[in-house]
Amino acid sequence: VSEINPTSASRAKALPLAICVPVRNEAAVLPQLFAAVERLERTGIAPRLCLLLDSCDDASLALVRDHAANASMPVIVEEVAASDANAGRARHRAMMLGDRSLDGDGVLLTTDADSIPSRDWLQAMVAGLRQADVVAGKVVRTVTQSNPLLDRLEAYYDALHALRRSLDPVDWEGKPAHHYASGANLGLRVASYRSLGGFQPLANGEDGRLVDDAARAGLRVRRDATCVVHTSDRRLGRVAHGLAGTLRTLDRDGEAIDVADPRDAAWQYRGHGVARLAFAKADFASLAVAVELTIDHLVGVARDCPNAESFAMRVVPTPPGGMRRVSLGIAEVELAAIPAGRRAA
């Protein structure tokens, strides 16, 4: 591990923050990431850029050294040679590099090497973390090849998430919000990251897993569309089943895509809303009927939960018929037929 170009400026009153990026043979895109990081508005924030170079055999390290020589923030680098790293393990290593650089106190943000944070990204993420424990920012594709089906898919899931918050409102949600969590734009405090055990060593989906774990632990997850990172719509990515893989699949056989049935999702969202109210009032009779559990069982679960978020995530099951999948076209029609869905969309 090495720190290149440490700053001597006083950082005592600024919020310590680490931008954590896993890098694997990204020489083609690192210059645009570095340029974007240099443009970040950082008033009141003491950022540092933490780069985990995972089995790189291109010019990535040379580019990092060239950038760090004149960077306006500390650049901290760790190289891992010939590793068995997958997406989750590499991102976790990048986050732990950031953790060590912060001495265990501050904010960890993560993005990807092919991403370009908006100028106000740091400020927006920090503002979000004043209201929540985890902030999942919005990822906007840099469109070099149109994909109307993916546009429809994203619009559907945004409308579905709006339905969720109309049926199960929480006061920490972003306004505007969006539907997903991506490692290209995610932030939380060091203590929160440690409490969750970090990103799991998964080949893909490590970001969604961390956010699900956070909600089940009772942490407030804020999906905030004002925290924006632009990312590549390249078709050749570093992660199996990542965005690049999704784009290739849609290019090839997109009309066959299926999505969550909004009727089943709405059933679960309503249950979450009922569970929150039951937890707040310590009155579990109506919830017991809805989820087919005994009042004694619900009281016991509530006793072990730190707050309503954790309780709702634990006690509301999947719908009686399971979480079905339907075609995107059918799902769009079904969502529009749900009264709260019409308002949400």
Where do the PLM segments sit?
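Glycine-rich, basic loop-to-helix element that forms the pyrophosphate-binding segment
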Residues: 81-102
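Short, acidic, metal-binding catalytic loop of nucleotide-sugar glycosyltransferases
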Residues: 35-46
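Short, flexible, basic/aromatic active-site loop/helix in glycosyltransferases
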Residues: 155-178
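Short beta-strand-to-loop acidic/aromatic patch adjacent to the donor-nucleotide binding site
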Residues: 102-116
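Acidic donor-binding loop at a coil-to-helix junction in glycosyltransferase catalytic cores
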Residues: 204-210
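Conserved donor NDP-sugar-binding/catalytic core segment of glycosyltransferases
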Residues: 120-153
